[in-house]
Regions:
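Primarily marks folded extracellular/lumenal domains of secretory and cell-surface proteins
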Residues: 1-82, 149, 155-170
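Predominantly polar beta-repeat domains that present long G/T/S/D/N-rich surfaces used to bind, process
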Residues: 82-170
Length: 170
C-alpha cells in the first residue's frame, strides 16, 4: 500500500499517522497490498472512497519483531466510508465518527472484511444482496476480527478507542 504523493500533514513525524482535512482519500483498484509496519490515515471533513480491494502483503509472522506485521487503520471524522460494488475484500480497521459506512451502488458480490469495523454499517448491508451458504462462511458481509490489531496496533488507534469508551461510560 503506497502513500499518496500528498496525503496531508503528519501530526506525529515519529509514527505513520497521516491526516487529510477537507478532502477525500480515494483508494483505487490498482493499489498495492499493505506492506510491513503499521499506519493510520485520519480523514477529517472528507470521505474515504474505496474503489478497490485492500489486502495485506504476505509477510511471515515474526514473534521477535511484531512491528513488521502489516496493519492499517482508516479513521473518518465527519465523513463517510464509501465502498464500491466491485470491492470484495478489505483488510484493516475502518472507523467512522459522525458518518456512515455505505455502498456506492447495489452489488450482488460478497464482501469479506479482515479487521475491525466501527460505525453505522447498516447502509452497507442495504446495498449488498449476495446470498451464500452461511455454514461455509459465505455471508453477504463477513467480518473476521484479525489479531494483528493487537500485535501491531496502528498508531493513534488505542487513544481513539480510549476516548470513545470513556464517552460511552459517561
Amino acid at each position: 500500500f503506497m502513500h499518496p504523493p500528498v496525503i496531508g500533514k503528519n501530526p506525529n513525524p515519529n509514527s505513520e499517522v497521516y491526516k487529510l482535512e477537507n478532502a477525500d482519500l480515494i483508494i483505487n483498484p490498482q493499489t498495492l497490498p499493505v506492506g510491513a509496519g503499521s499506519r493510520t490515515y485520519i480523514i477529517e471533513n472528507g470521505d474515504l472512497i474505496i474503489n478497490g480491494n485492500i489486502s495485506y502483503e504476505n509477510v511471515p509472522f515474526d514473534f521477535t519483531n511484531f512491528k513488521k506485521i502489516p496493519s492499517i487503520a482508516f479513521i473518518v471524522i465527519n465523513g463517510d466510508i464509501q465502498i464500491a460494488p466491485s470491492v470484495t475484500k478489505l483488510a484493516g480497521v475502518f472507523m467512522t465518527l459522525n458518518g456512515k459506512i455505505l455502498g456506492t451502488a447495489k452489488s450482488n458480490q460478497p464482501l469479506k472484511i479482515d479487521g475491525y469495523v466501527y460505525g453505522d454499517i447498516e447502509p452497507l448491508f442495504g446495498s449488498r444482496s449476495f446470498i451464500g451458504k452461511p455454514l461455509l462462511g459465505q455471508g453477504t458481509i463477513t467480518i473476521n476480527f484479525d489479531g494483528r490489531i493487537f500485535y501491531n496496533t496502528p498508531p493513534g488507534l488505542q487513544e481513539v478507542f480510549e476516548i470513545r469508551s470513556e464517552q460511552v461510560a459517561r
